[in-house]
Amino acid sequence: MAKVYKHPISGFTYAVNEVGLVRVEDPATGRYGIFDDNGVWYEGEIRDVDFQILGWVGRTPEARALREANS
């Protein structure tokens, strides 16, 4: 199962999506952003994220396997 992390300060949730990228979502507003594990932004309204958490969530073996399967 993919890792999901809730940021203790911002409240944003970080989770790996179906193609191995990290979806960052603000549960309060529904805004989101899609990033790779290095912090490169792909889409969405959110552009300012915690790069350390992107790495923790996006560099798991599960996330890597999804990226390889979808590339």
Predicted regions and their residues:
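N-terminal glycine/threonine-rich, aromatic-flanked beta-hairpin/loop signature
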Residues: 22-42
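Mixed-charge, Lys/Arg-enriched low-complexity segments
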Residues: 35-71
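N-terminal acidic leader/helix
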Residues: 2-27
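Short non-domain terminal segments
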Residues: 10-12, 33, 49
